[in-house]
């Protein structure tokens, strides 16, 4: 749990740092623009959120402040979950009422929902590690698993866009890896929800996300050094790596504490 907690904090702080440098919410993972292209004081709000992410993220690295940091991140990531919601109405108007459109919007929600779940579990663990209720664990498991399943369908319905991100030097082609990782997300989601090999699934999920960061996202950031999105995507993905690790640790602890 400690390593995942530290990575969660560092990656959150990095996301905040990039938001602060560009003085904006990162459009791909903090899509506040879904509400309006002209929100008064948006740059001020972005700076406040950036400082919040930096402060809360760094607090996770300091034992006495970690509980407060986890709570602060849970609040902010919970707020981020609402950013894409207007697109459930606006996106179909532009792109039609296709399943892929709704799945894509829900992917944006799920991206922050898994971070909210991880931050909440971390806060509960830091508050009283022996008192995380079975109900909370089950609810976290189901929501996280459903998010993974949504990511899977996002891959299946957006093969061309996702495949284009895969470097050409990787064998078998982008479409193969898009489908492969989609299946991996689907199996991970089902394992997490059902509790069958759930800890293994979360660890493999964390590894897959880490490899995606190293192989795909990191080179894109250096290739577009003045673009906020690639840098923010790297920070986000590292936070997601940590989120899967936090869930894995939480499931392990819950299993160890269960009556035999």
Locations of regions flagged by a protein language model:
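Membrane-interface interhelical connector segments
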Residues: 21-39, 156-176
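Extended, low-polarity transmembrane helix blocks
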Residues: 1-25, 41-55, 59-157, 176-187, ...
């Amino acid at each position: 749990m400690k390593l995942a907690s530290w990575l969660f904090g560092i990656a959150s702080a990095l996301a905040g740092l990039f938001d602060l440098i560009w003085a904006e919410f990162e459009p791909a993972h903090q899509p506040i623009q879904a509400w309006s292209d002209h929100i008064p004081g948006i740059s001020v709000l972005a700076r406040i959120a950036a400082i919040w992410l930096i402060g809360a993220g760094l607090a996770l690295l300091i034992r006495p402040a970690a509980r407060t940091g986890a709570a602060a991140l849970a609040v902010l990531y919970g707020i981020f979950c609402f950013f894409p919601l207007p697109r459930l109405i606006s996106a179909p108007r532009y792109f039609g009422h296709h399943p892929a459109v709704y799945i894509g919007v829900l992917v944006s929600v799920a991206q922050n929902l898994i971070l909210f779940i991880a931050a909440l579990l971390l806060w509960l663990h830091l508050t009283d590690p022996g008192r995380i209720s079975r109900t909370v664990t089950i609810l976290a498991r189901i929501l996280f698993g459903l998010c993974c399943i949504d990511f899977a369908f996002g891959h299946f319905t957006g093969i061309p866009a996702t495949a284009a991100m895969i470097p050409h030097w990787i064998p078998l082609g982008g479409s193969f890896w898009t489908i492969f990782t989609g299946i991996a997300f689907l199996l991970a989601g089902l394992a997490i929800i059902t509790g069958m090999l759930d800890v293994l699934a979360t660890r493999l999920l964390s590894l897959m996300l880490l490899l995606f960061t190293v192989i795909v996202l990191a080179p894109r950031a250096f290739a577009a050094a003045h673009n906020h999105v690639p840098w923010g995507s790297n920070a986000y993905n590292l936070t997601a790596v940590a989120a899967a690790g936090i869930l894995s640790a939480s499931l392990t602890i819950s299993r160890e504490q269960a009556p035999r």
